Amino acid sequence: MREIEISRAIVEAYFNDLLQNLQLDIAIVGAGPSGMVAGYYLAKGGAKVAIFEKKLSVGGGIWGGAMGFNRVVVQESAREILDEFGVDYSQVGNGLYVLDSIELASTLASKAVKAGAKIFNMVEVEDLVVKDGRVSGLVINWTPVMMTGLHVDPLTVEAKFVVDSTGHGAQISQHLLKRGLIKAIPGEGPMWAEKGEELTVEHTREVFPGLYATGMAANALAGAPRMGPIFGGMLLSGRKAALEILQKLGK
């Protein structure tokens, strides 16, 4: 075993993965709960999908549960998704279920990858490709390049649909806002768990031609309430976006 063999294996495998994912059916930005669920259902439905995550780890806000207590809650309407993914839970009354946030995050990631979604971590989306009034791809760079402010030109990824799953900041939609292509991003409202969960799913939609918003990004775009450590809306939002996109792609 030589060190160069290890290096060559890593470089060749990653290069081939990246090359194979420069042209996609769907590019998802953000590997949080809604993004990974969307990736799972899209891949399962036969679409070519990749998820781009700027952080080193995937999972978004799942890991820390609530105030560091690594448990989260999911409501009855999303329980079937937990069952499909094989996540364990315990009923705590009123149609609520408590589960281990570590199991949830790791299982969502594993199931998405096993279904065929490719996850690229440490890759940040610095802009969008917009042609003829439609989002048609991503402008990507390494997260460390973005963090250090180095003047390094990016690469692009082509996609028939882009999904903004970047959470509270709706960071991908912000690129459209600053160009005047969408009118406003009100940001999320004060805490109201029940209404926030309901509206998260309701506002999961195509917010601009070629661009869907899911999860807390959808909430931020609609000015809907935040909901705290209940994650059913995130799961349902990802599934809803995936099924709508698959239908539009004729899958």
Curated annotation (Swiss-Prot):
Pathway: Cofactor biosynthesis; thiamine diphosphate biosynthesis
Catalytic activity as recorded in UniProt: hydrogen sulfide + glycine + NAD(+) = ADP-5-ethyl-4-methylthiazole-2-carboxylate + nicotinamide + 3 H2O + H(+)
Entry GO MF terms: iron ion binding; pentosyltransferase activity
Keyword line: Iron, Metal-binding, NAD, Thiamine biosynthesis, Transferase
Pfam families linked to this entry: Thi4
Listed EC numbers: 2.4.2.59
Positions bound to Fe cation: D153, H168
Positions annotated to bind NAD(+): S34, E53, K54, G61, V125, H151, V152, D153, M216
Annotated glycine binding sites: R226
SUPFAM superfamilies on file: FAD/NAD(P)-binding domain
Domain of life from the UniProt record: Archaea
Names of the cofactor(s): Fe(2+)
InterPro entries in UniProt: FAD/NAD-bd_sf (IPR036188), Thi4_fam (IPR002922), Thi4_prok (IPR022828)
GO biological process terms on file: thiamine biosynthetic process; thiamine diphosphate biosynthetic process; thiazole biosynthetic process
NAD found in the keyword field: yes
Keyword Transferase assigned: yes
Quaternary structure and partners: Homooctamer; tetramer of dimers.
Family listed: Belongs to the THI4 family.
Function per UniProt: Involved in the biosynthesis of the thiazole moiety of thiamine. Catalyzes the conversion of NAD and glycine to adenosine diphosphate 5-(2-hydroxyethyl)-4-methylthiazole-2-carboxylate (ADT), an adenylated thiazole intermediate, using free sulfide as a source of sulfur.
Protein name: Thiamine thiazole synthase
Organism: Thermococcus kodakarensis (strain ATCC BAA-918 / JCM 12380 / KOD1)
Classification lineage: Archaea, Methanobacteriati, Methanobacteriota, Thermococci, Thermococcales
